[in-house]
């Protein structure tokens, strides 16, 4: 955590605590996603997420690990899964360039081994985006749908190779 953010941390924990009972009543699980230091100053690593969910201390509050952010913040992608273990509810798969899995430089073998080590059998989400100057703009031109379809097919093939 890049700065003294005790007040932000407390505010976040208190807010999630206040939402946890509503989540329980509606059979919903809230997930805390560590984001890289360029996008968040509160929860950046698996260790941060573990501390956060333990402070909230509610069965409806778990963690989400995102390979894109892990690639920036985690020294050991496998260890991040071991750190959070039973708290991991969702995994976002995204390569370093947000293109199809395998087109960037993330070593997914460490991610897969970490997931298998904890017996992860929950939700996996694929996150890709078509190349272009604005990463936050979904429509990148007339070939966007075609590119995204290609990324999805390539990425699904990788996921099947790793998990099936």
Briefly describe each language-model feature range.
Residues 43, 47-65, 71-164:
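Histidine-acidic metal/acid-base catalytic patches
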């Amino acid at each position: 955590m890049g700065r003294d953010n005790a007040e932000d941390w407390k505010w976040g924990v208190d807010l999630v605590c206040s939402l946890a009972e509503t989540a329980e009543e509606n059979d919903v699980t809230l997930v805390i996603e560590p984001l890289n230091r360029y996008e968040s100053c509160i929860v950046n690593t698996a260790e941060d997420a573990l501390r956060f969910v333990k402070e909230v201390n509610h069965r409806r509050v778990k963690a989400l690990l995102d390979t894109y952010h892990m690639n920036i913040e985690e020294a050991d992608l496998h260890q991040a899964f071991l750190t959070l273990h039973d708290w991991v509810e969702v995994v976002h798969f995204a390569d370093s360039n947000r293109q199809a899995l395998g087109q960037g430089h993330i070593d997914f073998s460490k991610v897969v081994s970490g997931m298998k080590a904890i017996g992860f059998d929950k939700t996996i989400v694929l996150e890709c985006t078509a190349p272009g100057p604005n990463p936050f703009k979904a429509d990148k031109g007339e070939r966007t749908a075609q590119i995204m379809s290609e990324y999805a097919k390539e990425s699904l093939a990788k996921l099947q190779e790793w998990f099936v």
